[in-house]
Amino acid sequence: MRLIILNLLSLGITPSVVGHSGPHRQETQNLNNFLESNAINPAAINGETRHTGGVHLACAILEASNQTAVVFPSDGELYTQIDKAHASATAPKNPACIYTPNDVKGVSLGVKVATFVQAKFAIRSGGHSPMEYFANIDGGVLISLAGIKTLEYNADTQTQRSGFGNLWQDVYRHVNAQGRTVVGGRTGSVGLALTLGGGLSHFSNAYGWAAQNVLSYEMVLADGSIVIASEEENSDLYFAVKAGANNFGIVTHIVQRTYPLGKIWGGSMIFPGNASAQFMAALADYQAKGQLDKKSAILPYVGLIADAVVAQFSYLEPVERPEAFEAFYDIPVIQDLTQVWDTFAAMVTAPIPYNMTRFSYATTDLLYDKEAYLEIERICHKYIPRMRKLEGGDIMLMPQPISVSMVGEARARGSDPMGVADQPQLWFVVSSGWNLAQDDAEAESIMLDALAEVEEYTKSRALHLPFYFLNDAFSTQMPLQSYGAVTYGKLQAASRKYDPTRVFQELVPGGFKLV
């Protein structure tokens, strides 16, 4: 608290402590000064709200600043609609209010208000994460970035500036119209916060991780200041935010490199579930040979109970059934939805025929080994009987082959905080899906038990790698620490420098924290 007070004093603001024994004259003046310094009429905040303080005062101040930007539970369906704008039904909570600013100054105000009254808050971009409290909060302020919709292509620099209220499909549509693309999400419905966790893309084989193709981040820091983080400005912050999640501030915009792109081939193939072992063998063969073609990429979903394997293929030229994927062509196909697409945006917005009401996931990393790929698939099959007991229960595997070229292309574009080993490897995700909230704990337990047995096996064969991809990590995993002691120390140093009062460690409870 002392550090918070010192920080506010440095801003010329004396913190209010309303809500303890009634508003005293000095406390009232402190609050009035804060309101006036932010162009808010003190008369807009009534005495009862001043006395209550905390999150209720924060919501009232934000409403006074922009009435249309704040939604309360009393707003009924509108509140529910915004609150539940998440990919998984595990994520919505019950925030005291939802604040949706439409520009970076509004985001800055949200942070300053929450800090001044010491109200806990969450930040939501696309809302893709299923983890509790990562992008929502109970009884605090939810700052939604849905109003930050900037889309600007600079033809002179061939760069794209995008607001964090966009989804990747919005960015792709905008930049594809220029005959260009960015390195972004593999499905169009994912948000831009993917670039705060490295970011795996269909373009990674050619250009590295998504974050390594971000030239600058526009951020709001804990004191409300707006800064640019890039190689030239605040380079230590730039390094940290590329894979450090929400520990340093709120990112509102990114500027990305773009690359030329015309028509492409890709889409989904659906294979029968009883071909899952054959698919894993083909995946290993693809990684050994086909993935050497940097234009190729694959995103597999192996549903063990849904009895289907769905693979999304991508090839960065309009070549029908490219040779890179020949390992998969001998597997029986239920449905082939691949085609030549006019734009990448059209492909990633096509629905993937796999959906779960409630889901979660956890990740592990292992070195390339065909025998191991087959064995970890067999291990996960053992957990089917437990999952079948849950309504809508399924176990889905996402075996993501990582090539040496992905690592090399990422490093070629600057310092990579993730420190991924330059060896062929598999980022292996075990995901659980189910229907009922009452089954949350059991569904996650099954998933984690399966993953633990997978790791026990890979460690026994000296294949385990101690890296956890943040964007696929479960809430109890420790991806930040998995970057190694040197990088983790740099993240901690950046946090101390840019958030000395620990706002994003203590007032923002969600996400992977620095300890």
Curated annotation (Swiss-Prot):
Keywords from the UniProt entry: FAD, Flavoprotein, Glycoprotein, Isomerase, Oxidoreductase, Signal, Virulence
Entry keyword Signal: yes
Cofactor: FAD
One GO molecular-function entry: isomerase activity
Reaction(s) catalysed by this chain's protein: prosolanapyrone II + O2 = prosolanapyrone III + H2O2; prosolanapyrone III = (-)-solanapyrone A; prosolanapyrone III = solanapyrone D
Transferase among keywords: no
Sugar-bearing residue positions: 66, 274, 355
Entry-linked InterPro entries: FAD-bd_PCMH (IPR016166), FAD-bd_PCMH-like_sf (IPR036318), FAD-bd_PCMH_sub2 (IPR016169), FAD-linked_Oxidoreductase (IPR050416), Oxid_FAD_bind_N (IPR006094)
Occurrences of domain FAD-binding PCMH-type (ranges): 91-261
Pathway terms, separated by semicolons: Phytotoxin biosynthesis
Annotated family: Belongs to the oxygen-dependent FAD-linked oxidoreductase family.
Protein purpose: Bifunctional solanapyrone synthase; part of the gene cluster that mediates the biosynthesis of the phytotoxin solanapyrone, a causal agent of early blight disease of potato and tomato. The prosolanapyrone synthase sol1 is a polyketide synthase that produces the octaketide desmethylprosolanapyrone I via sequential condensations of 7 malonyl-CoA units with one acetyl-CoA unit, and one methylation step. The octaketide backbone is further methylated by the sol2 O-methyltransferase to yield prosolanapyrone I.
Protein name: Bifunctional solanapyrone synthase
Taxonomic source organism: Alternaria solani
UniProt lineage: Eukaryota, Fungi, Dikarya, Ascomycota, Pezizomycotina
Gene: sol5
